[in-house]
Amino acid sequence: MDGLEQQKLAKQQELAALKRITALTDQMRTELDEMSIEVSKINKNAESVANVMANWDSIRKYISEASLGLLRYAEGDYQVGAWDGKENKSDKSNADKSYQSDDEHKTEPLPEALVRISVANNEESRK
């Protein structure tokens, strides 16, 4: 009977070891599942960052074009009263000129406005 008791103890120890291995395997599977979810989130965020970075070249180009539009005005154009002495060279009649207010001639020139321009890549990003 001594041999049987030793085999029984050996089998119980083996069973306990297998239960620990099973528990550790389940825990590792759970952690790997959570890690795969986090990796997929990181992947989506990386794609978003890549899309934003792809737009920076066009944004920089549009800002540059807008700032170049300001270069056509001299410093004197922004001084108060600089537009008062200039004559209206349009071919409008005097009746049409009477509808224009005096304030219209005294305003400073405004910079060109930025407008949205559709980019050909928009169709690709929607897919």
Swiss-Prot record:
Q: Which spans of this chain does the record mark as coiled coil?
A: 1-51
Where do the record's region annotations for Disordered lie? 82-127
Which UniProt keywords are given for this protein, alphabetically ordered? Answer: Cell cycle, Cell division, Centromere, Chromosome, Chromosome partition, Coiled coil, Cytoplasm, Cytoskeleton, Kinetochore, Microtubule, Mitosis, Nucleus
The UniProt GO MF terms for this protein read: microtubule plus-end binding
N-terminal signal peptide: none
An example GO biological process term is: positive regulation of attachment of spindle microtubules to kinetochore
Domain of life assignment: Eukaryota
GO cellular component terms, A-Z? cytoplasm; DASH complex; microtubule; mitotic spindle midzone; mitotic spindle pole body
**Basic and acidic residues compositional bias, start-end:** 84-109
Q: Where in the cell is it found?
A: Nucleus; Cytoplasm, Cytoskeleton, Spindle; Chromosome, Centromere, Kinetochore
Quaternary form? Component of the DASH complex consisting of ASK1, DAD1, DAD2, DAD3, DAD4, DAM1, DUO1, HSK3, SPC19 and SPC34, with a stoichiometry of one copy of each subunit per complex. Multiple DASH complexes oligomerize to form a ring that encircles spindle microtubules and organizes the rod-like NDC80 complexes of the outer kinetochore. DASH complex oligomerization strengthens microtubule attachments. On cytoplasmic microtubules, DASH complexes appear to form patches instead of rings.
Family membership: Belongs to the DASH complex DAD2 family.
Protein function: Component of the DASH complex that connects microtubules with kinetochores and couples microtubule depolymerisation to chromosome movement; it is involved in retrieving kinetochores to the spindle poles before their re-orientation on the spindle in early mitosis and allows microtubule depolymerization to pull chromosomes apart and resist detachment during anaphase.
List the protein's name. Answer: DASH complex subunit DAD2
